[in-house]
């Protein structure tokens, strides 16, 4: 019996490209997955190389407009987020290669999360609070830091990532520092 193919979505945002520690962690992960014999499909977004723009009001308004009521310009503005959402929904495993810059995420990675954290798409509001819509997925965070921050008050990145992933219903989270 053959193993089912694992659909892996990898997002990375190292300012130092192949010289960055988070990129090295991601490369090691992919190499280990290849060596495991597990069939997989990998979609990788280098958010720095892609030059992902920051979210603006026009783009957010485009998503808030029902798809069948969007103007041509709104459809164009929503296409980037809609594409990221389709990839995330299709993924079995989300791998986040996250360097720590100035106690937080790179702005490019925050811009990606801004586009996938969408009410009605990855979570919904209820009378008891938000409920994630992406249950059953796993997340692996490969966190690179220039110092010892994990488990200290200075680590604002880990709780931020846990909250964003949890908001979407991705509660099976693993962090490697």
Residue positions per predicted region:
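Secondary-structure transition/capping residues
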Residues: 40, 123-124
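Short helix-loop-beta junction
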Residues: 31, 35, 166-171
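Beta-strand-loop-alpha "switch" segments that mediate conformational coupling across diverse proteins
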Residues: 175-177
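Gly/Ser/Thr-rich active-site loops/lids in small-molecule metabolic enzymes
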Residues: 116-121, 164
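Short, glycine-/small-residue-rich phosphate/pyrophosphate-handling segment
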Residues: 125-170
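N-terminal beta1-alpha1-beta2 submodule of the flavodoxin-like/Rossmannoid cofactor-binding fold
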Residues: 1-98, 103-107, 111-114, 118
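A structural motif corresponding to the C-terminal end of an alpha-helix
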Residues: 87-92, 137, 168-173
